[in-house]
Amino acid sequence: EENAAIPLGAYSIRETPGDVLVLPKGVFHWNPAQPIGCAGLRRTMQFQELYSDAVIKPIRGNVLTRLEKLDSGAYGALILAEAGLKRLNLSDRISVRFSPEQMVPAAGQGVIVTQSRAGEYSELLKQLNHPDVALCVKTERRLSALLEGDCSAPVGCHARLHGNHMTLYGFSGLGGVPKHALVQGEKTNAAALAEALARQLQD
């Protein structure tokens, strides 16, 4: 969380933001009869929209722990963030990639952000910061806040820039009903776009 004393500073270049399906080593086709290891309602609800007969089983632990459980036979597949696998040099484990339109990511997914005491390292952070990424993540976090989505809530948002134009994808499973929506407009109106998308998802 951010506060005035310890603000967010530099936003990294965004790694691939989507989620992926990972199969056990040596397996090339997902067996729908085996459970899918998935942490979080956002992924669970969206995956079940794509595959209504899928059996979802909760999973905990870091990426390597989850992969060990997968390869031991406890799960038939996992749903993970592609960015995490790439940063661990495990891209070869990816079997299926889901686009942000198919499975809307969590706000800020794929981005590393610094946080430090106010006023410290300000010049360095300016050099490290990527303003367009910062705008996208702040817009995504704005939507999440408007929907009152904490880190465990079934809420997703992904902002994409095309020049000065922004496309904002949103997902909400609040209330148990999955809803998808998108809005488009000028990036200078990013806050208003987040508010418009929140209204669509709350209707």
Language-model segments: residues:
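A conserved helix-loop-strand patch within extracytoplasmic ligand-binding domains
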Residues: E1-D53
